[in-house]
């Protein structure tokens, strides 16, 4: 077994929605990113890559590469799962914490879990997503952006 940790942050910018866990959520701002800015899927991808000792998403999908401009992070996550599997690993479970003052995540979490489970090729009960605020402290509390911590457990195939 192997464990990995992922962390990602994106700041708010222009736009009227964000994408988290593959779910489009209306919001007064968008997230600034080279890809679609799905900070949740980026953190999960990093956790999986870390557990397999395969680097991070910046190594596999550099923001200097125009092929990944506006990329669908669900497609990137599925690619990560494939390369992790090529190295002999399968997903045991993943757990993520979204750190954001707004928007409220609770109405979207079950949909996120379902989409993530689909992309990972696992059951929904192997995926946990939760959200918290920082009680208006720090950059997330000031609503300057969103952060996500994620952990992944990999098991030999």
Swiss-Prot record:
SUPFAM superfamilies per the UniProt record, alphabetical: IpsF-like (SSF69765)
Keyword Transferase carried by entry: no
Residues at the site labelled Transition state stabilizer: 34, 133
Protein residues bound to 4-CDP-2-C-methyl-D-erythritol 2-phosphate: 8-10, 34-35, 56-58, 61-65, 100-106, 132-135, 139, 142
Pathway named in the protein's UniProt entry: Isoprenoid biosynthesis; isopentenyl diphosphate biosynthesis via DXP pathway; isopentenyl diphosphate from 1-deoxy-D-xylulose 5-phosphate: step 4/6
Alphabetic keyword roster: Isoprene biosynthesis, Lyase, Metal-binding
Matches recorded under NCBIfam families: ispF (TIGR00151)
Function: Involved in the biosynthesis of isopentenyl diphosphate (IPP) and dimethylallyl diphosphate (DMAPP), two major building blocks of isoprenoid compounds. Catalyzes the conversion of 4-diphosphocytidyl-2-C-methyl-D-erythritol 2-phosphate (CDP-ME2P) to 2-C-methyl-D-erythritol 2,4-cyclodiphosphate (ME-CPP) with a corresponding release of cytidine 5-monophosphate (CMP).
Oligomer and partners: Homotrimer.
HAMAP family attached to this UniProt entry: IspF (MF_00107)
Name of the featured protein: 2-C-methyl-D-erythritol 2,4-cyclodiphosphate synthase
């Amino acid at each position: 077994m192997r464990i990995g940790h992922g962390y990602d942050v994106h700041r708010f910018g222009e736009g009227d929605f964000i994408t988290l866990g593959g779910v489009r959520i209306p919001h007064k701002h968008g997230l600034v990113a080279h890809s679609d800015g799905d900070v949740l899927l980026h953190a999960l991808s990093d956790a999986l890559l870390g557990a397999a000792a395969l680097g991070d998403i910046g190594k596999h999908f550099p923001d200097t590469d125009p092929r990944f401009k506006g990329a669908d992070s669900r497609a990137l996550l599925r690619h990560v799962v494939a390369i992790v599997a090529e190295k002999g690993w399968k997903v045991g479970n993943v757990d993520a914490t979204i750190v954001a003052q707004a928007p409220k995540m609770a109405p979207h979490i079950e949909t996120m879990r379902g989409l993530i489970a689909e992309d990972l090729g696992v059951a929904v009960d192997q995926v946990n997503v939760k959200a918290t605020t920082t009680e208006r402290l720090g950059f997330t509390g000031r609503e300057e952006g969103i952060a996500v911590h994620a952990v992944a457990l990999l098991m030999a195939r």
